[in-house]
Amino acid sequence: TNIDLSEIISLISYDQALTYQLLKAANSAYVGSVSRITNVQEAAYFMGKFKTLNLLLACAFGSKLRNTKLPAYEEVEGQLWRDSVIASITAEQCSKVFRLRIPPETACAALLLNAGKVILSRFISDEMKRYISERRLSGRDQIQAELEVLDTHYVELGGIIAEHWGLPPEIAIGVKYQHDPDKVKKATSDVTHVCYRWMEFLSSPASSGNGEIKINPNVIQRLQPSSKAWFEVMQTLVKERYQKVCGDYGLPEQWLLPKQWAFDERGNDSMNGAACA
């Protein structure tokens, strides 16, 4: 990989907020620490390079993402942050519901799945946005519409950004192939595909009857679910962890709750299970 742990430690050591968050994470019951950790170097080595990198990315972009809204993608303020956090949490929890070993870089890749959206939203013209919207209305999905108008799309651009930043190759692969994991058949891109579909599922209106998560069946076969109830287990794990993260950031548990969860909170069954498509 292109990033050394000592470089990450150097970045964190001179930032009070990052140092606090790293020490807090390393000493938390969630990580499973058995003894108190008191310095950045010890905390980083204890957590490992990729968990530390994930924390660095989350802290560096968290406040910006919470205040960002993307009208071009019909996303309200905070939705980009929410989806990025849920994607990263989903990647972390995949090791609990799938038998295949999940690479440690995967949570970092999941956190950056929508990075390309931010770039496109800033630099494409209103006219191009209108053309994309027209193609969406005619039945294309977001990626097809962008490809027809721009000859690229936000997923491909996100992969290029990850490569440009010098992030580990597995992270770039996870970002770039989230939509088409069969092209590379890597565990990282298989998991980010699950994360991509998970965000799509949670953001869809539950009242519309769309209570299934549509995942490439080849991905499920490669990841090897540990039980037939993997979807329900994942739903519970991700929801509980997301609410804890909201608490850590001082946000209400119901803050910007995904539509599927909000619907379920009202006493309706929105978890119909997983579908392969």
Question: Residue ranges of each PLM-predicted region?
Answer:
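Conserved alpha-helical "signature site"
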Residues: 1-127, 142-217, 255-265, 276-277
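Post-HEXXH active-site segment of zinc metalloproteases
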Residues: 126-137
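General structural signal for secondary-structure boundaries
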Residues: 3, 39, 75-76, 140-142, ...
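Terminal helices and disordered tails flanking the catalytic cores of nucleotide-processing hydrolases
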Residues: 213, 217-277
